[in-house]
Amino acid sequence: LTLLAAILFSGSFRGNPALPDPDGDGIRTLAAKVATGVFRVTRHPMMWGFALWGLSHMLVAPRMDSFLFNGSLVFLALAGSYGQDRKKEATMGDAWAKWERQTSFWPRLSQLGKIEPRTLLIGAVFWFAATWAHNLAGSYEAGIFRWL
């Protein structure tokens, strides 16, 4: 789950019409394009990355503090995505409606194979670095480092 979260998160920085845009023109241009990469999986890859990260941490550390912190993160990511859709509908109108028609709120796992190799590599490197850094942060080893 955390590898998928890292891939979705990493891919969300390029060509994302949900990011803030003061003048609005660049975002409308992005929303008019055909969805590619992680946006074929979900229109909120960054937020789903946060949600999957939180869910995975609740699964590996089923304690009350983990449920409270990570459960809040999951809730904020998904509720925030829903709220962002409503805000973009109001501010972008038809451009966002077109984007919504070609993307999905819920991840479409069948589209994972459409993610560019570059994004997969960046996500894997990010995941590797984040799992390696657990020990440096004073936590226990995570991911593959638990077994090395």
Question: What role is predicted for each listed range?
Answer:
Residues 43-148:
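Hydrophobic transmembrane alpha-helices
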Residues 25-38, 99-109:
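Short membrane-interface loop/juxtamembrane segments of multi-pass integral membrane proteins
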Residues 1-34:
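Portal/gating segments that form or line small-molecule/metal binding sites
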Residues 1-4, 40-48:
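Membrane-interface loop-to-helix entry segments
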